[in-house]
Amino acid sequence: MEKKVEAILEFDKIKKQLTEFASSSLGEQAILELAPATNFQVVQKSQLETEEGAKIIRLRGSAPITGLTDVFAHLKRLEIGGDLNGLEIYQIGSNLRVSRQMKNFMTDLLEMGVELPLLGALSDELLVLKEVEEDIAISVDESGKILDTASEALSTIRRTLRRTEDRVREKLESYLRDRNASKMLSDAVITIRNDRYVIPVKQEYKGHYGGIVHDQSASGQTLFIEPQSVVDLNNERKALQAKEKQEIERILAEISASLAGWINEIHHNTFILGRYDFIFAKARFGKAMKAVTPHLSDAGIVHLIAARHPLLDAANVVANDIYLGEDFTTIVITGPNTGGKTITLKTLGLLTLMAQSGLQIPAQEDSTIAVFEHVFADIGDEQSIEQSLSTFSSHMTNIVSILEKVNHKSLILYDELGAGTDPQEGAALAIAILDASHEKGASVVATTHYPELKAYGYNRVHATNASVEFNVETLSPTYKLLIGVPGRSNAFDISRRLGLSENIITEARSLVDTESADLNDMISSLEEKRNLAETEYEEARELARGADALLKDLQKEITNYYQQKDKLMEQAREKAANIVTKAEVEAEEIIHELRTMQLNGAAGIKEHELIDAKTRLGKAKPKTINKTIPQAPKQKPHVFQVGDNVRVLSLGQKGTLLNKISDKEWNVQIGIIKMKIKTTDLEYIQPETPKKQRIITSVHSSDSPVKSELDLRGERYEDALQKVDKYLDEALLAGYPQVAIIHGKGTGALRTGVTEYLKNHRMVKSIRFGAAAEGGNGVTIVEFK
């Protein structure tokens, strides 16, 4: 891509704005070197990196990249055996810390299931040098000062040095507190001269303290004297400072030698972190601009929805739809100057450069932009004074250069094509240049104010007209691009609005040839119809967006509903299974108990014990519970067709096939909802055959073999209870409201057992002994619910 084109389209201003979002000089340097790529796969990867960066910003707000520094020069010094200073070592340690934090940050995101194939792969390349990082952290602070914890020797030296300095200050402060201090000292302060502690003594008392004079005031009236009593202490202090310096140099050399063994790893970490900073800068820039990741086309197709020029005020800029490469490859934008035609050219050109640089573009979702090998632009007055070229000559020189380099993977932007010369010749040249550009296979957008080019879009199948809307009421352009509508002259309307006599306007109209006037009237009518259609389209699109949002909400609610339903069903099944298991265990225990009683012999068992055990066995029997989910019988393979009735397995709902999206997916109508369903999630439902109407009759009839009474006299206890259980079921099915159980009076054991059993039967409403006429207490009357 030519740098000249980047300058014309003001791509450098985009890069300048982008640098404000970088966190380090490494990110800024990557931005300064940024240039549009021309390889489709490279552009695709760059866009995916930016999209992944944007995903991270959406999820986490930021990334732990703060603290990254350019340390490549430091590593060069280590490479040749040099030692680093404290600040340089700290900066390398800071990069190691950022490397570790960034790797942990990315690991957390990946473990959460966030799809980050490119940025995740970058984090795999980061090497964590925890020990080296910790050695630096305990040795150097952010200002580059060597810490006491760097070595035991340094800590000891500094403790001794502090004590020595305290002794010096204490001795000098005693002079300041002396009662004669105000007379002999110019000021009651301790200061430093030549790195020695001194006090300011008046000239006439210089011999009082002895010692060494290190300096004097400008007037000579004050001498800065190191008293003899602290000379030795100051000497000791200087010696300790020398030891401190020597130990610091040793520590720096030791750390430098350690870092020298990791030069390649630190270099690569720093490079990777610089890439991260660059990618996150692109993502934050896109967010600030409310930009989107475009679809990319390697077939020259452009379909920008509500595209905005990124350098214009976002609150006032007019968004336009721009499409090219499908129905036509050339757009000729006609109409008067100052109508916003050039802005359209620059918007398309600049957004193309941005997209091919891996930047998101200011447009709506689902916008598509092409990847071109070349972008050429002949925009503005590039007249060269040095070359003494006219405007026309300058443009023509540029166009000649473009036509020499252009190919089928090129985008050409011509501004005011053919301008600067005789209108008739200029229009003819413009048409010939457009034809030549098309023959080379290029995609072209050109602006012109020549009316002769209005016919170009109609006469060439590869071309279409366009114009920028003009509001006659306000006498200003709306900057709205109208593709398919040629520009028209508004001179008469504007003149009338400005007060020109109607007679003059009428005469002027008569001088315009009829064909031209009819064309302008036709264009005017076409504009009105287009505006109406566009308004209705926008309203329809807004309704469609609302309906789409509602559909997505409904689909989400339906999915949540069935997920919750499945969850509750699963919980119910588990609970039911537990009840059944518990009941089975309890029943087995009771049966075992009964068998034990039988083995012990009836003589040793009381009747009420048997009754109690049998009753507990009845209670242990649970209500019928399905422990397994009914499985649909396996069907023969069915070739799905439009209109088939199906069951959506994941939702448990029936639906109808609307249309086939692919071999793996269908559109299915489920009630009022239309959903995309995978073929593997569908089960064919056979059409139901009409069923014959059945006449339902009463369960019991006059010739029912079930009697209204059961005679148990002479029966053994266990056999009697089994007969009662079976008889009650038959009586219920026969429809009896009540029945009689004849058990006799006897010892009362059978009567007691039957009574206890009936009390616990779920279908028995009440029981009573029979009246005298019914058999007295030898009969139990049972009333059903």
Swiss-Prot record:
Keyword set, alphabetical order: ATP-binding, DNA-binding, Endonuclease, Hydrolase, Nuclease, Nucleotide-binding, RNA-binding, rRNA-binding
Binding-site residues, ATP: G335, P336, N337, T338, G339, G340, K341, T342
Superkingdom of this protein's organism: Bacteria
The Smr domain, residue ranges: 710-785
Record-linked PROSITE patterns: DNA_MISMATCH_REPAIR_2, SMR
GO MF terms, alphabetically ordered: ATP binding; ATP hydrolysis activity; ATP-dependent DNA damage sensor activity; endonuclease activity; mismatched DNA binding; ribosomal large subunit binding; rRNA binding
EC number: 3.1.-.-, 3.6.4.-
One Pfam family recorded for the sequence: Smr
Xref: InterPro entries: DNA_mismatch_repair_MutS_C, DNA_mismatch_repair_MutS_core, DNA_mismatch_repair_MutS_sf, MSSS, MutS, MutS2, P-loop_NTPase, Smr_dom
GO biological process, one term: rescue of stalled ribosome
Disulfide bonds: none
Quaternary structure annotation from Swiss-Prot or TrEMBL: Homodimer. Binds to stalled ribosomes, contacting rRNA.
Role, per record: Endonuclease that is involved in the suppression of homologous recombination and thus may have a key role in the control of bacterial genetic diversity.
Family per record: Belongs to the DNA mismatch repair MutS family. MutS2 subfamily.
Protein's name in the database: Endonuclease MutS2
Gene name for this UniProt entry: mutS2
